[in-house]
Amino acid sequence: MIYEEFLTLKGKDFKGRTLDDIWSFSDKEIEENHDFIQIIFPLNKPSQSVFHGYYLDSQDLVKQIKNNKEATNNIIKSSKWFISFLERNTYWNSYHDHNQLRITRVIECLRLLVSDEAADNFYNNILKLIKDNNEVNMRTLNFWKNA
């Protein structure tokens, strides 16, 4: 899989899905599929949850994606797509939920590949979602804050 091609809508992931395919997932598909989040929000370290082996394995690859405006715009679009899922489905606002790990990944990816501002905006939007009824544990809140 070539990350830059995938993130610019020119390639497919390791399962043959395009970014558009993933953006068209139903809420049920988002909840039940656990391998897409590492693909649409890549990091420079392997996932501790899903072991497909795909990550940004060189600083050159990180720079290449970071300097590709189309790729970074699509990462931002993916973050908006994911936050809309979180707005529609509030069960993740609990003591522990796997979507909280996904939130951490999104923040880390935005910080790595887009900007601190984009990461901070996503983080602040998450805090707004839980503002009136926060059930998320303090450890997770600290992960988000420090991501």
Q: Can you describe what each PLM-predicted range is?
A:
Residues 1-90, 110, 117, 125:
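N-terminal leader regions that mediate targeting or early regulatory function
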Residues 85-147:
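Alpha-helical bundle/repeat cores within regulatory domains of eukaryotic proteins
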